[in-house]
């Protein structure tokens, strides 16, 4: 594990290293990741099968004990892993794809380790968030990552309403089977003509970057879902049972800045609207 970087920790105990892994292609793995996987003694993985597949794809013979670390076991496993760190054992933390702590429980282990005065460092690398932003062509100077939208229709509508006037570019993860509904909900809250980009299967063989307005993309997602050949056991497809396949990252443009130019009537939006509400100011004494 890395031993040359400084950290706010005390230096006692083991080191927690957050290791970014490829989001699609195994050969996107960095040389440093290959070296750390090969020499790790304890790996905490969101899905143990995925890290073993990655190691096999990279011709790495894992010597490490590999333990699972995902939402359902997070509370118990955080305490166990913290104990390992306090006993002086280094831990390599990996997620299914991309950077640990981004839309997964890894941040909880980081928080616990930092609170205990233990050293935390990172092995940087791929992230679907920044990759999607880069290929989207939408502004990247300011953005917000919103993770997976709420599943409940009411809660999802409230979240989208809160984001509708945010001028930052917004990035979401979404499951293929819910993509059409999410795009339709965003079109209703943000406006049908808001630009957006659907990034599907980033870096993989069937990568697809679909650009358009929210309304156009919602229609596209419905058509793709209806064309999905997956069927029920009896061979009859259920209405709405199809889905856009693959891992989805959705990038949505932020709200446009309101124009401060005079309109056809000579009024300046915002300024003249406010003056009509408060009336003329009294003269100075």
Place the predicted regions along the sequence by residue.
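Glycine-rich, flexible N-terminal cofactor/catalytic loop recognition
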Residues: 1-71
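A contiguous loop/helix-start segment that scaffolds small-molecule binding in enzyme catalytic cores
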Residues: 2-3, 7-14, 89-90, 169, ...
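Short active-site oxyanion
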Residues: 37-43, 117-121, 169-170
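Short beta-strand scaffold positions
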Residues: 45-46, 104, 173
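Alpha-helix capping/helix-boundary segments
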Residues: 49-51, 98-99, 128, 178, ...
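Conserved helicase motor
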Residues: 67-76, 149-152
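Glycine/small-residue-rich loop that forms an oxyanion/phosphate-binding "nest" at active or ligand-binding sites
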Residues: 78-127
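Class I SAM-dependent methyltransferase SAM-binding "motif I" and its flanking Rossmann-like core
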Residues: 107-166
């Amino acid at each position: 594990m890395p031993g040359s970087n400084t950290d706010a920790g005390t230096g006692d105990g083991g080191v927690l290293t957050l290791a970014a892994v490829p989001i699609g292609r195994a050969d996107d793995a960095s040389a440093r990741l290959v070296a750390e996987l090969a020499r790790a003694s304890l790996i905490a993985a969101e899905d143990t099968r995925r890290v073993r597949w990655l190691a096999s794809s990279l011709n790495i013979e894992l010597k490490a004990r590999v333990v699972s670390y995902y939402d359902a076991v997070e509370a118990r496993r955080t305490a166990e892993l913290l104990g390992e760190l306090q006993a002086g054992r280094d831990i390599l933390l990996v997620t299914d794809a991309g950077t640990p702590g981004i839309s997964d429980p890894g941040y909880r282990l980081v928080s616990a380790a930092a609170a205990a005065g233990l050293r935390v460092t990172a092995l940087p690398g791929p992230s679907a968030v920044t990759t999607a932003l880069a290929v989207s062509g939408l502004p990247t100077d300011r953005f917000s990552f919103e993770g997976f939208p709420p599943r409940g229709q009411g809660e999802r509508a409230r979240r989208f309403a809160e984001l509708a006037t945010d001028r930052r570019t917004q990035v979401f993860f979404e499951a293929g089977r819910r993509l059409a509904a999410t795009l339709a909900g965003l079109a209703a809250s943000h406006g049908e003509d808001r630009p957006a980009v659907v990034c599907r299967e980033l870096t993989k063989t069937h990568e697809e970057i679909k650009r358009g307005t929210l309304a156009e993309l919602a229609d596209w997602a419905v058509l793709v879902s209806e064309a999905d050949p997956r069927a029920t056991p009896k061979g009859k497809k259920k209405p709405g049972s199809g889905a856009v396949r693959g891992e989805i990252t959705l990038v949505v443009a932020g709200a446009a800045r309101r124009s401060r130019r005079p309109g056809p009537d000579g009024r300046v939006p915002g300024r003249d609207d406010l003056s009509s509400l408060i009336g003329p100011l009294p003269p100075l004494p």
